[in-house]
Amino acid sequence: MTTQYYTASSLDGFIATEDHSLEWLFPLGDLNDTGYPDFIAQVGALAMGASTYEWMLRHVIKPADATPGTWPYAQPTWVFTSRELPGVAGADIRFVQGAVGPVHRQMRAAAADRAIWLVGGGELVGQFHDAGLLDEIIVQVASVTLGAGRPLLPRRITNPPLQLLSARLIGPGFSELRYAVAKQTLERTE
C-alpha cells in the first residue's frame, strides 16, 4: 500500500492558475486517455484539503444546479479543514483537522491493501511528506506553461532527491513522470 500524490502540472510546475482555475487543463485531452482509469481503480482512500474540496463542490457537484452532480469517488475521502463545510449526499466524506499522521492511520485501515491518493494542492501533500508518509509522486506534465500559479509542491526536495521510477508519453499533450520519495524531512519554501 502506497501513499501517492497524483496530479497534472504545467511544464513550468503549476497545478492551477493563481485564482485556482484548471481551465488550462481541460482542452489538452480526455481524462480516459490518460493513466487515470487504471490509477483510480487501485485507490482505496483519498485525502484533500478544503480548497480542493470546495473546487469540487463548485465545478463538479454544483449543489445550486437543478440537477447537481454526484461525488465522483466511491472510496472514502478525508477532507482536511479548519472550518465547517457542507457534505455531499451519498458520499463517504470525513471532515478532519489537525496532524496528518493519525488520519493517515485511519486511511490505511480503510484502504486495506490499496493506495491512498493525495488529491489537489501541494500544501497538504507537503504535510504528508514532512511526516514521512508520502511514498510516490506521479505527475502528468502538460505541454503548456502558465508563468505563475499554484505550485506543484511548495517544498524543497534536494537531498536526497526524488528517484525517477518511470517516464512515459501520454498522447500529444502529456508525459507522465513517476517518482519514489525518500523518507526525509524537507525544507519549506515560501
Language model features with spans:
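Enzymes that bind and transform nitrogen-containing heteroaromatic metabolites
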Residues: 1-190
